[in-house]
Amino acid sequence: MRAVAKYVRISPRKARLVADQIRGKSYPEAASILRFTNKRAARILGDVLKSAAANAENNHDADPELLFVEEVRVDEGPTIKRYRPRALGRATMIRKRTSHITLRLGAPEGVPVGGAVDTPGDEEEEE
């Protein structure tokens, strides 16, 4: 039950500040923290959290309200390089950093996660 957002145009260092706030929290608590955090990364992480909850509900038949943020990782993506003109004909490089955000939801110990997922061909034939 995970969700990944790749090539997000936010500095990994700034995104990690918000990611550290929700690590280990329950899904409702993490969603509430992100809703009231006044940072651009909070909105991005909120979208990834919602996506992970939707994946848990649709793919694993799990109730997102019972899950918690098991892992949230912000890795560095490729850096977009731009140049800014400076004095005396010089130029300096501007680095626009990108992030890869991975968020995994898990169930606390002893709590079953959803039902079995039905796949075609699993039914036993009756004779």
UniProtKB/Swiss-Prot annotation:
Disulfide bonds: none annotated. Residues 106-117 have a biased composition (Low complexity). InterPro entries: Ribosomal_uL22 (IPR001063), Ribosomal_uL22_bac/chlpt-type (IPR005727), Ribosomal_uL22_bac/org-type (IPR047867), Ribosomal_uL22_CS (IPR018260), Ribosomal_uL22_sf (IPR036394). CDD domains: Ribosomal_L22 (cd00336). One of its GO terms (biological process) is translation. GO terms for molecular function: rRNA binding; structural constituent of ribosome. Keywords: Ribonucleoprotein, Ribosomal protein, RNA-binding, rRNA-binding. GO terms for cellular component: cytosolic large ribosomal subunit. It comes from the Bacteria. Pfam families: Ribosomal_L22. Residues 106-127 are annotated as: Disordered. PANTHER family: CHLOROPLAST 50S RIBOSOMAL PROTEIN L22-RELATED, LARGE RIBOSOMAL SUBUNIT PROTEIN UL22M. This protein binds specifically to 23S rRNA; its binding is stimulated by other ribosomal proteins, e.g. L4, L17, and L20. It is important during the early stages of 50S assembly. It makes multiple contacts with different domains of the 23S rRNA in the assembled 50S subunit and ribosome. The globular domain of the protein is located near the polypeptide exit tunnel on the outside of the subunit, while an extended beta-hairpin is found that lines the wall of the exit tunnel in the center of the 70S ribosome. Part of the 50S ribosomal subunit. Belongs to the universal ribosomal protein uL22 family. This is Large ribosomal subunit protein uL22. It comes from Rubrobacter xylanophilus (strain DSM 9941 / JCM 11954 / NBRC 16129 / PRD-1). The gene is rplV.
